Amino acid sequence: ALIDENVPVVVVAPDDELFEKTVSNMQEVAARGGQIVLVSDANSDKVGCRVATHLSVPSVHPFAAPLVYALPMQLIAYHTATFMGTDVDQPRNLAKSVTVE
């Protein structure tokens, strides 16, 4: 199984028309013991399952939501990479994918 108590699952869940379906998926993850990191503008009490960490973002217009949700996701990626010892300023294989004219 891919999900167990050692696997954090980052969930981006704006409080919109798809929120209930996202909550259903989160409950499946929680039932399998996964650690849920919730990034949402909704109250974590609305989820109905245990959340390891809740990163709260402000409620904004749906057109601005991608910008608001991008910041915590970038910070999660940055801090995960530095924790793992990855040089975030010199990523591996970058020269192979970037061509200079």
Task: Identify what each model region corresponds to.
Residues 1-101:
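A SIS-like phosphosugar-recognition module
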